[in-house]
Swiss-Prot record:
Keywords attached to this entry: Ribonucleoprotein, Ribosomal protein
Biological process annotations from GO: translation
Protein name: Large ribosomal subunit protein bL27
InterPro entries hit by this protein: Ribosomal_bL27, Ribosomal_bL27_CS
Amino acid sequence: MAHKKGQGSTQNNRDSAGRRLGVKKFGSEFVRAGNIIVRQRGTKMHPGNNVGMGKDHTLYALIDGVVKFEHKDRNRKKVSVVSQNFGE
């Protein structure tokens, strides 16, 4: 049996930190313009009304309003922001 670890096992003990992806604002939650709604890799969810998409596929609100999750079609989800007119 070896009494030293060997070079391979000591070099392999690293792990990268999690990327903090996922939904940041949930359905019927109030958001302001510019708030991030979803961080994702690829288009798991697509932008709907009043939602923009960044170059890393992050979805964010374009207006102040309430988040609404809905189905775009059978297997695609869509995120929209519905404006709230407070007695105007």
